[in-house]
């Protein structure tokens, strides 16, 4: 799964409704940029081949890219209407430009059945949406979405430009009619006391002991599914966007984020149907603190989204030490 995190809060954001400079859309595998040096897995960038194929780790189709590419691409976002209002349909237009040439990027690798994954998260982390803009003929992506409430949001753009590396770019947005401040929008995350949640008749358990997530260390994130009524293991999860599950993991300050998927290989054979009852995601939490994990899965053609909140400790830190520090902390004056 993805461990590298690309954050570009300095990305250009244009909330003016102006037209973007048009590009020329081209077929994915035609006229590949000269920077393309191989085929890589978007989830495992170290998996590189000289010819098209699939990832030996997760089974994903490899896409043209440069495993040595480190430059962050430039993303420009515009909205129509210019002022984004809660409860009103808004058209988002997204244009991507090459970091070195400034030219419009029009070729993208398909990652989990889509060219672009667009996450909309409210600043207080109570709202979460996973959308997929469509690629227009002029090379820009377009999405229509209605925000449910006024406030501050962070928009995460997850895509794979042909000839580059995986990108995960964050862009802030404040709606019209929001009269609060940053402090009022700040989340107050607390680790879940129960790691079992219910959604659409499915009991979902995050099977991890408290204190097991350590900053800077790779960790398994195991999820177990049971039928809510019968208690029987769920074995009929459906593939949604090419995987049996999706997870967005986001730090409380929104500076660290990972878009992850479970391993899809079992004894060397790609699973095509009948997912469950257990999925294992892999993640590396870059720094300590509270994180929210949004898990998405599909069963009986119904897509469910469940949030979990977990604590990530510093290396050498334990929950007992953390509680002791809080008990002896000097009161604020």
What do these predicted ranges mean?
Residues 5-7, 11-333:
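Intrinsically disordered, low-complexity terminal tails/loops enriched in metal-binding residues
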């Amino acid at each position: 799964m993805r461990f590298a995190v690309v954050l570009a809060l300095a990305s250009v954001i244009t909330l003016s409704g102006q037209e973007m400079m048009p590009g020329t859309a081209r077929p994915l595998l035609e006229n590949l940029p000269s920077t393309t040096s191989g085929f890589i897995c978007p989830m495992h960038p170290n998996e590189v081949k000289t010819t098209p194929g699939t990832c030996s780790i997760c089974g994903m189709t490899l896409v043209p890219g440069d495993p040595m590419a480190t430059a962050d691409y430039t993303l420009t976002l515009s909205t129509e209407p210019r002022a984004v209002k809660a409860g009103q349909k808004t058209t988002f237009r997204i244009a991507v430009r090459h970091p070195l040439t400034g030219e419009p990027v029009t070729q993208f690798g398909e990652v989990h059945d889509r060219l672009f994954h667009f996450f909309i998260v409210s600043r207080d982390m109570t709202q979460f949406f996973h959308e997929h803009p469509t690629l227009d003929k002029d090379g820009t992506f377009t999405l229509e979405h209605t925000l449910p409430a006024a406030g501050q949001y962070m928009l995460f753009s997850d895509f794979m430009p042909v000839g580059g590396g995986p990108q995960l770019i964050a862009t802030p947005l404040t709606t019209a009619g929001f009269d609060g401040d940053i402090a009022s929008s700040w989340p107050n995350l607390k680790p879940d006391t129960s790691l079992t949640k219910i959604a659409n008749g499915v009991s979902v358990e995050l099977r991890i002991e408290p204190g097991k997530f350590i900053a800077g260390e790779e960790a398994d994130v195991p999820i177990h599914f049971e039928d809510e009524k019968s208690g029987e293991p769920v074995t009929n999860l459906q593939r949604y966007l090419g995987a049996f599950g999706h997870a967005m993991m986001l730090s409380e300050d929104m500076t660290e984020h990972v878009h992850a998927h479970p391993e899809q290989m079992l004894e060397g054979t790609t699973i095509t149907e009948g997912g469950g009852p257990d999925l294992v995601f892999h993640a590396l939490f870059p720094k300590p603190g509270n994180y929210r994990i949004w898990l998405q899965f599909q069963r009986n053609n119904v897509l469910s989204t469940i949030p979990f909140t977990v604590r990530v400790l510093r290396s050498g830190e334990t929950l007992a030490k953390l509680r002791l520090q809080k008990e002896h902390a000097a009161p604020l004056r």
